[in-house]
Curated annotation (Swiss-Prot):
Tissue-specificity statement: Expressed in leaves, stems and flowers.
Organism: Arabidopsis thaliana
Encoding gene per record: CCR1
Knocked-out gene: effects: Dwarf phenotype, delayed senescence, collapsed xylem and significant reduction of lignin content in ecotype Columbia. Retarded growth, impaired upright growth, altered leaf morphology, dark green leaves, collapsed xylem and strong decrease in lignin content in ecotype Landsberg erecta.
Residues at the active site: K165
Enzyme class: oxidoreductase
Protein's pathway: Aromatic compound metabolism; phenylpropanoid biosynthesis
GO biological process: circadian rhythm; lignin biosynthetic process; response to cold
InterPro entries linked to this entry: Epimerase_deHydtase (IPR001509), NAD(P)-bd_dom_sf (IPR036291), NAD(P)_dehydrat-like (IPR050425)
Region Disordered, annotated ranges: 317-344
Annotated protein name in UniProt: Cinnamoyl-CoA reductase 1
Length: 344
């Protein structure tokens, strides 16, 4: 059933794992649009959730609810009375016991609670991990929303994060079909961009390790990237668009790790960035092909990876996670010439 949310004002939605990297930006956008937001967190009084209360509209229209992903009754109480649900909460670990069952149960619990509450639409944050991991796919094939990872490959390589994401998404689709819930799923690639939360998450460490000098080399790998602000907006767009359905791949560009390091070196030459690849024997890995046309058709315009990297580093500096070095005399001019928006 297509959802109709022509006027967000007065509408209430639930965001699970509201204090997370992507979720915090979703909450911000929802509050700016006039929604009342019920955000689930493990402990509403934890100082690490203070950034949510400080968001514009937070004091008036944000309710933080204590709910663990494995506590069905608590999730049900949070979702009750909501028009929509954004399920972003999920374990991020390589431990199969902590990753797989909690992720699957969490997805099922949210769908079941949404069905009981007669929620109009559920939007779930899945991952490229549920899409891309297939060694038998033609390297020249274009990765799109119809692609699924190979479960046996994920299991045999002990890639429990991707395995968990895939089985959790499959469980969500099966439960939604069984319960008659309108479900839309987003599959973002590696997410960059400025964090609202005070803590460092795994994808931000991906950038931080190069800047601090802890990574002396970069891997001979390619990865696709997307900005956290675009991912958050995509969640809201697919919730609000009556025509939205199925899965949406969220990726701006696919790049070799060496290219990412080169961009960082041009933007921030003061940091001890690696200059050598860990694997110089084999040919340089080629980025895979993908299409992001489906989400573009809903009006999403992607932030460039270069801009995203710049904003990520500036934010890490401002939050005290990265010591700001003294800028070279021409840094400001060089950044402008590189097509970067300063202070955005």
């Amino acid at each position: 059933m297509p959802v109709d949310v022509a006027s967000p004002a007065g509408k209430t939605v639930c965001v699970t794992g509201a204090g997370g990297y992507i979720a915090s930006w979703i909450v911000k956008i929802l509050l700016e649009r006039g929604y009342t937001v019920k955000g689930t967190v493990r402990n509403p009084d934890d100082p690490k959730n203070t950034h949510l209360r400080e968001l514009e509209g937070g004091k008036e229209r944000l309710i933080l609810c204590k709910a663990d992903l494995q506590d069905y009754e608590a999730l049900k109480a949070a979702i009750d009375g909501c028009d929509g649900v954004f399920h972003t909460a999920s374990p991020v670990t390589d431990d199969p016991e902590q990753m797989v069952e909690p992720a699957v149960n969490g997805a099922k619990f949210v769908i079941n609670a949404a069905a009981e509450a007669k929620v109009k639409r559920v939007v779930i944050t899945s991952s490229i991990g549920a899409v891309y991991m297939d060694p038998n796919r033609d390297p020249e094939a274009v990765v799109d929303e119809s692609c699924w990872s190979d479960l046996d490959f994920c299991k045999n390589t002990k890639n429990w994060y991707c395995y968990g994401k895939m089985v959790a998404e499959q469980a969500a689709w099966e439960t939604a079909k069984e319960k008659g819930v309108d479900l839309v799923v987003l599959n973002p690639v590696l997410v960059l961009g400025p964090p609202l939360q005070p803590t460092i998450n795994a994808s931000l460490y991906h950038v931080l390790k190069y800047l601090t000098g802890s990574a002396k080399t970069y891997a001979n790998l390619t990865q696709a990237y997307v900005d956290v602000r675009d991912v958050a907006l995509a969640h809201v767009l697919v919730y609000e668009a009556p025509s939205a359905s199925g899965r949406y791949l969220l990726a701006e560009s696919a790049r070799h790790r060496g290219e990412v390091v080169e961009i960082l070196a041009k933007l921030f030459p003061e940091y001890p960035l690696p200059t050598k690849c860990k694997d110089e024997k084999n040919p340089r890995a080629k980025p895979y092909k993908f299409t992001n046309q489906k989400i573009k058709d809903l009006g999403l315009e992607f932030t460039s990876t270069k801009q995203s990297l710049y904003d990520t580093v500036k934010s890490l500096q401002e939050k005290g996670h990265l010591a700001p070095p003294p800028p070279p005399p021409s840094a400001s001019q060089e950044s402008v010439e590189n097509g970067i928006k300063i202070g955005s």
